[in-house]
Amino acid sequence: MDKERISYHESVQKMYERIKADNMTNVWDRYEAQGIGGVPDRRCTFCMAGARCDLCSNGPCRSDASKDKRGVCGITADGMAMRMMLLRNVMGASTYHYHTDQTIRTLRETARNKTPYSIREPEKLKTFANRLGIDISGSDAEIALNLCEFVEKDFNRPAYEPSRIVEILAPPERKKRWEELGIFPGGIYGEMMLSTSSCLTNVDGYYVSLALKAMRLGIAMAYQSQIVNEYCQDVLFGIPRPHTMRVDLGVLDPEYVNVLPNGHEPFLGFAMVQLARKPEWQEKAKAAGAKGLRVIASIETGQEMIQRWEEDDVFYGFTGNWISQEAVLASRCVDLFAADMNCSLPVAPLYAEKYNFKLMPVSDLVAFEGIEERLNYDPVEAEEQAAKLLDMAVENFKNRNSSGEAALNFPAGEAVVGFSTESILDALGGTLDPLLDAIKSGAIKGVVGMVSCTTLRDYGQDVHSVAVVKELIKRNILVLSMGCGNAAMQVAGLCSPEAREYAGDSLKAVCEALGVPPVLSYGTCTDTGRLADLLGAISGALGGVPVPDLPVAAAAPEYMEQKATIDAIFALALGLYTYVNPVPTVTGAPNLVKLLTEDCREVTGGLLNVETDAVKAVDGIEQHIMEKRKKLGI
């Protein structure tokens, strides 16, 4: 297989050869076995077009818009495609909110002094509570408890009762437009019920109605789930601030006990770092024959952690995104893989057996065939649970290398991570004016929020994302990166000071003056909400310029799963030009395609652009940014 069909990253390319030599199932070979993209392509053309449905016993049905061929119930291809998209959106929103629910649970128990965590950012707690209209005259614990009560009450509002969180946090112009469209949301639970119920057979088959419900759900998700989640995690674990972090597979050293918290929830990861930094745990590891004990960040759980806590010899580094997972597990450097919500592959038990590591589900969402033992996260028991996990890892080290050699000599780079609204303001001297001045002068043409996964659909891991971002910064467009795509940028070296050499002259000069890279590591996919709040602040700083008129865009060069689809729908509701790749499974729905790629501009101000070529994709983004600059007279 061609190296670039595997991955952009040399480390993963090399590990693929090891995995092949070991005759292990892997994501690349499984992709090829599906016949996807082959000649001929063996995918079902109706499935690829989104023109099929199997929700009821009359089906499976296929539809063809060119012949007005409908499902047995009478639903059109447009309705089929959008209904399935809305169901994906519900899955994405639900999973985002599961994380939020666990964060609020953790904050409440921390306020009651029942967890190993603390309120690390009392000022952030007060600032956020004050924005929500919560009394901040009491103790930090009282404020935190009142905050938990306030947001949970809002989450549980019925869909017909407007969300207070959205009312308070969203930009005024956006709220007005959402009210006009009838998509101002209620509570997130009510919105998920409304959306899911709408997808029942013979309920809502109208693609426009379904699309508006998707936007409504996306708005509720972004403000209630994402913003509340990230800001409350800031309160508990720290506001992201810039610092360097080791990245890539070279952070794995087989002579250490290596623990990998993996998924999207950082709670047990942070608890393990706190314990592992204590001398007694290092001594336990050394008594087992290791040089020490390390916690290695992985995927989005790791991204949440590295944004907030600095590296040392215990919290040692970050591996990469989800397609790197089998490469990491096959390294024979892992002792414990703690799998929380999201992004732990179903084949992990096969890798655990082959490469001698302990696989432990730590979320009630996660299960693996053949793995009966589990340790579901409980904030009150978090320290005890973390200790059990570290003990498992130390015990595993004794036998890890009994049946094979570890992979050695992999590269490790450095990335600057930890950008947030607060840290950007700090870098700018406490005001957005320097950034706005750079945009007004043209030194920075515009800003792109890159919220992406990684996928093998058209290219190897991260190949397309890196190509798009390199092209953006070459054209003096600043990038804020989030999600698995953020890991792509970090490991590819684009979040380092040296990446300024890829930037256009004026962006390079701004980055040098501010001491930042041209790609700002802005967090996880959940930080989409944080980005929306930043755009609201920029809109306000410019005197209320509508978000659709800002020289900004969203990009998902390698979206993959259901969370990504709700992020994209929210971006459209927010009024953003939104670039996505691969081609979504809606091409058999011509009216829906027209709605998303043309008519949406008149509805919300947003627009979906789909393009598989990196240069053409950036051409579209740049053209949009230049049009907005012209409209603003800058």
UniProtKB/Swiss-Prot annotation:
Comment field on protein domains: Cluster B is an all-cysteinyl-liganded 4Fe-4S cluster; cluster C is a mixed Ni-Fe-S cluster which is the active site of CO oxidation. Cluster D is also an all-cysteinyl-liganded 4Fe-4S cluster that bridges the two subunits of the CODH dimer.
Subunit structure as annotated in this protein's UniProt entry: Homodimer.
Entry keyword annotation includes Transcription regulation: no
Top-tier EC class: oxidoreductase
Coiled-coil positions: none
Entry's Gene Ontology molecular function annotations: 4 iron, 4 sulfur cluster binding; anaerobic carbon-monoxide dehydrogenase activity; hydroxylamine reductase activity; nickel cation binding; peroxidase activity
GO biological process, any: response to hydrogen peroxide
EC number: 1.2.7.4
Record field: catalytic activity: CO + 2 oxidized [2Fe-2S]-[ferredoxin] + H2O = 2 reduced [2Fe-2S]-[ferredoxin] + CO2 + 2 H(+)
Binding site for [Ni-4Fe-5S] cluster: H264, C343, C453, C484, C525
Functional summary from the UniProt entry: CODH oxidizes carbon monoxide coupled, via CooF, to the reduction of a hydrogen cation by a hydrogenase (possibly CooH).
Alphabetical list of InterPro entries matching this protein: CO_DH_a-bundle, CODH, HCP/CODH, Prismane-like_a/b-sand, Prismane-like_sf
UniProt entry tagged with the keyword Metal-binding: yes
The protein, known as: Carbon monoxide dehydrogenase 2
Residues reported to bind [4Fe-4S] cluster 2: C53, C56, C61, C73
Biological source species: Methanosarcina mazei (strain ATCC BAA-159 / DSM 3647 / Goe1 / Go1 / JCM 11833 / OCM 88)
Cofactor: [4Fe-4S] cluster; [Ni-4Fe-5S] cluster
Family named by the database record: Belongs to the Ni-containing carbon monoxide dehydrogenase family.
Binding site for [4Fe-4S] cluster 1: C44
Cofactor binding mode and count: Binds 3 [4Fe-4S] clusters per homodimer.
